[in-house]
């Protein structure tokens, strides 16, 4: 970065064409010869601004969002400033010239004060792990800068380019909506206490909790701490005046591999293109950026056309609108919206806007906001994606494209190409090498012309289409009534049916169109059209994209929707002609999806006499996280080398040879290390030593590390890693759980649990059912990928800074791999950007890689896994297959369960034994079953080793259980809630593993939820809705959970803590747990503050480190507060006991003075606390009758969810979810409610949206947010109510509390079971009353095909 003296002086500044100038957070930046291959994210992080996070590198998570501001000239030659949120990971550094960049650091910080957005997100508990937070704040900030008069609904719909895995989104939305300048069309949602709370102050009716301080007060006023107040724009930083006068000239930047051009005229652009015909045109880099990053494609010449006036204009013409090819999708949408709005009161003009409305309807679901803000219409067309959202719309509309080039004399030559001739084959279009796309002409719609667009994807927001389409028909009155459209019949004069996702390119259906033209618009044409669509849109078995039956049924289902939509309009036009009558039951099929404003409430109980325990105190690091000052591993400012693993590209193969010679010659490369370079033991198995750090002979999964490349930068190491040549001898691979079962590929391990007398159970049963149920995998998708920084010290000392839930295990295995003592390795961290179990063991192998490299290089080495590497190598939640047999009475009482559980462990054990054990323990969920026989087996496959994930096998077993409960309900014709109630454990009843269920809150939770959710009234309303609607169906389900709390391995139920009290009265706490967003540090601070009776501000936690607290258990199993809290309390009590004699002599002195007096008296004010959970531990026996008690106590909860499905597409919406969870006396209701909401949404995603797809070759297809879909802002329940059960103290844990992280996750499956009820209602329309299997997750494909109507049956294999 160069700061030229003229930049800040008064003399004219003359910039060279190889210099890049922009403003960064208000300061001028000038770079000589910038690297054309650098993204904005790469550059900004390289200069030490770490608020932008690298979450995915494909523009789909929003962690790297920043605000880009620039001056735009309008048609009337006026200038306006445009602010937009864009993705730093894709937006090129070289495209910033003349613009202003604002990152999170430019908004506010702790020292100078928080921006109002930062403050409200922080105060409203909108940040847990914090990794996604800066990006979310910048998305909101940019939106409010551009849209200061936004409604709450406008704001709520702005986050489609951002993801959060922790919060469940509700607190973020509440904080964001407080900036609305005006209410939405719907009733304004007032924002109550943070979190939106109904507070029940136990034991003191006169006191309330002040939302500002979290302390008791007596004002008796529940005042919102989050004001409903717009952002004050006049106090925001102004756009740099320097840039208002900045002359945008041509640029040329030359890098080692790529040359970047920014021309200013069309002639200049065409001249470059004529000379360099292979040049790529880049506007937003949203496609080229993916190709260069993930496919290692190098484009030597890049041309950025955003300064060429002809390409950035939009013009109205007599017959339509002409859009310049470089116009962004957001700009186009805004322009078209303006046309529509201006003609709202002009019926004739408004009828011309049909195509514009169709485009806007598709843009709503096109990628995310940040991508639309950068991507251009021309780029979308020229990419020619076969699953494009917009191309079918433009095909149907009859758009015309203009190409332009220079002839040999330098004259411009233009060529018109109708869009139906533009797409030639897969990603090949009719553009000559010297041509560019100049503009797109979009015609107006004509009278009696109807155009409608549709799209179905796995997730509504920011997802690629499974099928997209657009239909246009031009009707004319039949001759005898042509003089008057009233009461007339109509026939089709012209039509286009355009589809994406059904061929290698976007296509039209010529045969169907030909059949339709001349036909009378009536129901009779539907059957013929559907049959012709079948032949027009063939898909062979095994076609790319899969889902053959589903995709084909969408083609006809969408046309049926379109037919109803047009008919409904014709019914009005024709004055009620019965030919066009759409029945009341059918009408909802024509409704476009429109999400109401979300809302809800959070209820909890506090106990003022326990302050600060039970108080809603915000996250300790919230302010740091909202300002971007919270540091994660990759943010540590230390010069280091970078390591990248070299993976096996085969799922099962002997490694015959490895040649790194070419890689070692690449720029910046320092070394290549493999198994022969490991000084200690080549083993990183966390429990059973069956994993190699680097493969010695045989790769056991696709992605297995063969070695690592070390280079000066991550990009250099990544590129060089692809140059390592590996010769394989491929071996047969097992890549699915079904394949493992059929081939008997199991680990030599089984666990059996038996209770009662199975023969007696069967004999007492009036009915016996059996079946099989499959539970899919789930990717953790923590926003911060795995990362480690290893710093060598004196001799063989190493400091390992790792994003891990398991510092002690990391320390131990790194020491073993290096052949040194654990006393020479310190593992430490401040926080993780999410974990969810995925960093309990799988983080360790990347730490070992960095440690090996650092050991040899004698330099700091950093390894940060790219998202695709992380997802494809670190394992998932275990998928399960269950085979069950259940006996029950005619009254619904369950008598016997025979269950076989098969879990896919992957290629190694990892901690799969513990996962399977917990699944076995939770196979009965909340129900007393007197006779059980449960066998668990681990399948061995050539896939990444699966690992811990929130719930640790419990959710898989419980969803299996609830599936057969539904089958019991179906068999008996009883409501499923009655089956559940009838079989609940009663107080002190004993489980199959011989543990008494004491302090049983299940029935109480259930009964309260029945009332709070209005279950019975809503069940009636759902039935009424289903009778009145044919193609939209609703379902409602109420689901319980009983979750055992403890590690099932006895040894892990221990914790340590170190507490220091200083003479100024402040306290430093260190404990063995890791902070990953769950608020553990905040709770530990509360416990220490309570013990010493000091404000929470006097207690501080800096980090977790193995040289402060050694030999710790991983932060997992939802008991970290239980374990570490007791250890902290123990240390505090030791110190207090030592202080007591001094206190007795000085009873009235403040705590600070007491500390000084203790020091004077030589009292030790430091203590090492320890806690071990008593009376826990369980050992399975071959007989099936084990020994011990696996759990310290149980959590109880229940959730009721109501959904609506579209039976023609499989789309679903969660209308309402009510959750009640027993957390004892909550240590911190704000934290705990956040955990409940986040876990619920994660569980909802696991059981509905999130599908891990692995090819038969072992290659994982879902390796990033573009292919793997976690819930987004749009997916959370529209009404979301969460309550913490009151008056339920738990005598088994710290301050009568309970752990909270895992138990709520399974309750998200209430959405899955509500979907099942809705599908059942849909099947009844087709007289299908038999049981049907609905495997988990209930994806849109499974929902649609399970509805089993004629549209599905048309394509079902016989």
Curated annotation (Swiss-Prot):
It catalyses: xanthine + NAD(+) + H2O = urate + NADH + H(+); hypoxanthine + NAD(+) + H2O = xanthine + NADH + H(+). It comes from the Eukaryota. The gene is xdh. This is Xanthine dehydrogenase. Belongs to the xanthine dehydrogenase family. Disulfide bonds: none annotated. Keywords: 2Fe-2S, FAD, Flavoprotein, Iron, Iron-sulfur, Metal-binding, Molybdenum, NAD, Oxidoreductase, Peroxisome. The keyword Kinase does not apply. It is found in: Peroxisome. Substrate binds at residues 840, 918, 952, 1048. PROSITE patterns: 2FE2S_FER_1, 2FE2S_FER_2, FAD_PCMH.
């Amino acid at each position: 970065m160069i700061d030229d003296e003229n930049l800040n002086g008064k003399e004219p500044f003359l910039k060279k064409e190889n210099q890049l100038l922009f403003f960064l957070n208000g300061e001028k930046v000038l770079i000589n010869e910038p690297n054309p291959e650098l993204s904005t994210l790469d550059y900004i992080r390289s200069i030490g601004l770490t608020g932008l996070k690298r979450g995915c590198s494909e523009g789909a998570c929003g962690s790297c969002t920043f605000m880009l501001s620039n001056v735009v000239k309008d048609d009337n030659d006026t200038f306006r400033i445009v602010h937009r949120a864009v993705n730093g990971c894709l937006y090129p550094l070289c495209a910033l010239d003349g613009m202003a960049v604002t990152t999170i650091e430019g908004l506010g910080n702790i020292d100078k004060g928080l921006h109002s957005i930062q403050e409200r997100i922080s105060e409203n508990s909108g940040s847990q792990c914090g990794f996604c937070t800066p990006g979310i704040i910048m998305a909101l900030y940019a939106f409010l800068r551009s849209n200061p008069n936004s409604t709450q609904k406008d704001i709520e719909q702005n986050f489609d380019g951002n993801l959060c895995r922790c919060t469940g989104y509700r607190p973020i939305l509440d904080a964001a909506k407080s900036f609305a300048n005006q209410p939405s069309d719907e009733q304004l949602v007032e924002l109550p206490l943070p979190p939106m709370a109904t507070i029940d102050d136990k034991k003191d009716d006169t006191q309330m909790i002040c939302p500002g301080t979290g302390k008791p007060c007596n004002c008796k006023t529940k005042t919102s701490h989050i004001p409903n107040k717009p952002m004050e724009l006049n106090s925001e930083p102004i756009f740099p005046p320097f840039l208002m006068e900045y002359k945008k000239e041509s640029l040329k930047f030359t890098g080692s591999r790529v040359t970047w051009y920014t021309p200013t005229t069309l002639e200049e652009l065409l001249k470059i293109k004529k000379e360099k015909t292979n040049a790529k045109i880049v506007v937003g880099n949203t496609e080229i950026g993916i190709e260069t990053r993930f496919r290692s494609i190098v484009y030597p010449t890049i041309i950025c056309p955003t300064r060429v006036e002809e390409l950035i204009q939009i013009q109205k013409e007599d017959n339509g609108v002409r859009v310049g090819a470089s116009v962004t999708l957001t700009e186009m949408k805004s322009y078209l919206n303006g046309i529509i709005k201006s003609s709202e009161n002009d019926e004739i003009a408004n009828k011309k806007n049909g195509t514009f409305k169709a485009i806007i309807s598709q843009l709503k679901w096109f990628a995310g906001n940040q991508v639309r803000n950068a991507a251009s219409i021309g780029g979308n067309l020229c990419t020619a994606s076969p699953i494009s959202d917009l191309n079918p719309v433009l095909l149907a509309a009859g758009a015309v494209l203009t190409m332009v080039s220079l002839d040999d004399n330098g004259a411009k030559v233009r060529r018109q190409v109708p869009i139906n001739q533009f797409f030639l084959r897969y990603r090949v279009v009719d553009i000559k090498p010297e041509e560019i796309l100049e503009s797109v002409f979009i015609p107006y719609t004509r009278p009696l012309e109807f155009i409608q667009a549709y799209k179905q994807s796995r997730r509504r927001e920011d997802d690629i289409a499974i099928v997209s389409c657009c239909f246009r028909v031009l009707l004319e009155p039949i001759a005898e009534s042509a003089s008057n459209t009233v009461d007339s019949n109509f026939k089709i004069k012209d039509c286009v049916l355009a589809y994406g996702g059904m061929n290698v390119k976007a296509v039209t259906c010529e045969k169907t169109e030909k059949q339709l033209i001349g036909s009378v618009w009536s129901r009779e044409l539907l059957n013929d059209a559907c049959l012709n669509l079948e032949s027009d849109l063939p898909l062979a078995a095994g076609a790319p994209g899969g889902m053959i039956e589903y995709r084909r049924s969408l083609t006809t289902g969408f046309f049926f929707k379109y037919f109803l939509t047009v008919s409904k309009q014709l019914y009005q036009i024709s004055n009620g002609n019965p030919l066009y009558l759409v029945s009341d039951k059918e009408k909802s099929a024509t409704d476009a999806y429109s999400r109401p404003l979300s809302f809800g409430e959070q209820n909890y109980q506090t106990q003022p006499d326990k302050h600060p325990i039970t108080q809603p105190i915000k996250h300790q690091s919230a302010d740091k996280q909202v300002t971007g000052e919270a540091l994660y591993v990759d943010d540590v400012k230390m010069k280091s080398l970078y390591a990248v693993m070299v993976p096996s590209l085969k799922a099962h193969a002997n490694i015959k040879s490895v040649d790194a010679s070419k890689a070692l010659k690449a720029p910046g490369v320092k070394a290549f290390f493999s198994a022969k370079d490991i000084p200690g033991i080549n083993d990183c198995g966390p429990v059973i030593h069956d994993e190699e750090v680097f493969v010695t002979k045989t790769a056991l999964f696709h992605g297995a590390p063969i070695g690592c490349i070390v280079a000066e930068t991550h990009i250099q190491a990544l590129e060089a890693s692809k140059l390592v040549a590996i010769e394989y001898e491929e071996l047969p691979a097992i890549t699915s759980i079904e394949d493992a079962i059929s081939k008997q590929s199991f680990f030599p391990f089984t666990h059996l649990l038996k209770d009662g007398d199975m023969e007696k159970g069967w004999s007492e049963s009036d009915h016996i059912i059996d079946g099989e149920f499959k539970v899919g995998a789930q990717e953790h998708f923590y926003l911060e990928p795995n990362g480690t920084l290893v710093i060598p010290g004196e001799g063989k000392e190493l400091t390992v800074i790792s994003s891990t839930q398991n510092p002690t295990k990391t320390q131990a295995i790194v020491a073993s791999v290096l052949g040194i003592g654990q006393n020479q390795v310190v593992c430490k961290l401040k926080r993780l950007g999410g974990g969810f179990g995925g960093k309990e063991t799988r983080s360790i192998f990347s730490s070992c890689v960095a440690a090996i490299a650092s050991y040899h290089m004698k330099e700091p080495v950093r390894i940060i896994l790219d998202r695709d590497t992380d997802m494809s190598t670190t394992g998932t939640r275990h998928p399960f297959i269950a085979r069950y047999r259940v006996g029950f009475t005619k009254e619904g009482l369950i008598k016997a369960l025979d269950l076989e559980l098969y879990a896919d462990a992957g290629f190694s054990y990892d901690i799969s034994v513990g996962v399977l054990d917990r699944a076995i323990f939770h196979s009965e969920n909340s129900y007393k079953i007197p006779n059980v026989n449960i066998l668990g087996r681990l399948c061995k496959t050539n896939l990444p080793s699966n690992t811990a994930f929130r719930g640790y096998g419990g959710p898989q077993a419980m969803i299996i259980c609830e599936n057969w409960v539904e089958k019991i309900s179906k068999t008996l014709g009883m409501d499923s809630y009655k089956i559940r109630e009838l079989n609940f454990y009663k107080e002190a009843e004993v489980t199959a593993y011989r543990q008494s269920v004491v302090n049983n809150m299940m029935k109480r939770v259930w009964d309260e939820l029945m009332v709070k959710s209005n279950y019975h009234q809503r069940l009636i309303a759902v039935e009424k809705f289903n009778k009145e609607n044919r193609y939209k169906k609703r379902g409602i389900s109420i689901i319980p959970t009983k979750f055992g709390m403890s590690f099932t391995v006895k040894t892990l139920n221990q914790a340590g803590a170190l507490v220091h009290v200083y003479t100024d009265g402040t306290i430093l706490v260190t404990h063995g747990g890791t902070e990953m967003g769950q608020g553990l540090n905040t709770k530990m601070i509360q416990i220490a503050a309570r013990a010493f009776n000091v404000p929470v501000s006097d207690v501080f936690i800096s980090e977790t480190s193995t040289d402060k607290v050694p030999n710790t258990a991983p932060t997992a199993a939802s008991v970290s507060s239980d374990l570490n809290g007791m250890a902290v309390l123990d240390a505090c009590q030791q110190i207090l006991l030592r202080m007591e004699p001094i206190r007795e002599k000085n009873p009235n002195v403040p705590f600070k003075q007491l500390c000084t007096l203790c020091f004077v008296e030589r009292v030790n004010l430091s203590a090492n606390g320890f806690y071990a959970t008593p009376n826990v531990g369980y050992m399975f026996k071959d007989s099936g009758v084990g020994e011990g008690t696996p759990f310290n106590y149980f959590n109880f909860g229940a959730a009721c969810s109501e959904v609506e499905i579209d039976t023609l597409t499989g789309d679903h919406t969660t209308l309402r979810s009510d959750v009640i969870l027993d957390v004892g006396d909550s240590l911190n209701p704000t934290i705990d409610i956040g955990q409940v909401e986040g876990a619920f949404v994660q569980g909802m995603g696991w059981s509905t949206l999130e599908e891990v797809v692995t090819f038969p070759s072992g290659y994982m297809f879902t390796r990033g947010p573009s292919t793997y879909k976690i819930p987004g802002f749009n997916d959370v329940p529209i009404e979301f109510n969460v309550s913490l059960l009151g008056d339920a103290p738990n005598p088994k844990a710290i301050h009568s509390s309970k752990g909270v992280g895992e138990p709520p996750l399974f309750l998200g499956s209430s959405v899955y079971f509500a979907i099942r009820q809705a599908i059942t209602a849909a099947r009844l329309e087709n007289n299908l009353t038999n049981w049907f299997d609905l495997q988990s997750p209930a994806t849109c494909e499974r929902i649609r095909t399970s509805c089993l109507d004629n549209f599905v049956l048309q394509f079902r294999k016989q």
